[in-house]
UniProtKB/Swiss-Prot annotation:
Keywords: Cytoplasm, DNA-binding. GO terms for molecular function: DNA binding. One of its GO terms (cellular component) is cytosol. It comes from Synechocystis sp. (strain ATCC 27184 / PCC 6803 / Kazusa). The lineage of its organism: Bacteria, Bacillati, Cyanobacteriota, Cyanophyceae, Synechococcales. This is Nucleoid-associated protein slr1847. InterPro entries: YbaB-like_sf (IPR036894), YbaB/EbfC (IPR004401). Binds to DNA and alters its conformation. May be involved in regulation of gene expression, nucleoid organization and DNA protection. Its main location: cytoplasm. Signal peptide: none annotated. PANTHER family: NUCLEOID-ASSOCIATED PROTEIN YBAB. It holds the Pfam family YbaB_DNA_bd.
Length: 114
């Protein structure tokens, strides 16, 4: 190997590598905190008629379903439609919340592809 020639890892590259590791560690620590935060969230979703409310965690885990007694008058098909609407609404809100929180976590880190 010629004098002064290395493996292409000059001081600048080592500094970049250290910064990349630090960013990865920040994201890992932040992701753990975020995961715990999302687990504690209770995100509601309602049916269009307002008779069914679904609570879902920030991790899209269904937590509970509240059904107004008058929803039973809609019959099985109508009730099923209301529950499905409420589930979809809660899921959409939960995934949007998760996406938004992930953006907050990674903003300013200049991560490729994020």
């Amino acid at each position: 190997m010629a004098q002064g020639k290395g493996f292409g890892f000059g001081l600048g590259k080592i500094k970049e590598l250290q910064e990349a590791f630090q960013k990865a560690q920040q994201v890992q620590e932040g992701a753990k905190v975020l995961q715990e935060e999302l687990e504690r969230m209770e995100i509601p979703g309602k049916s269009a008629d307002g008779l069914v409310t679904v609570l879902m965690s920030g991790n899209q885990e269904p937590l509970s379903i509240e059904i107004d007694p008058s929803a039973l008058e809609k019959g099985a098909e109508g009730l099923s439609a209301s529950v499905t609407e409420a589930m979809k609404a809660a899921y959409a809100e939960s995934t949007e919340t998760m996406r938004s929180k992930m953006e907050e976590l990674t903003s300013g880190l200049n991560l490729p592809g994020m």
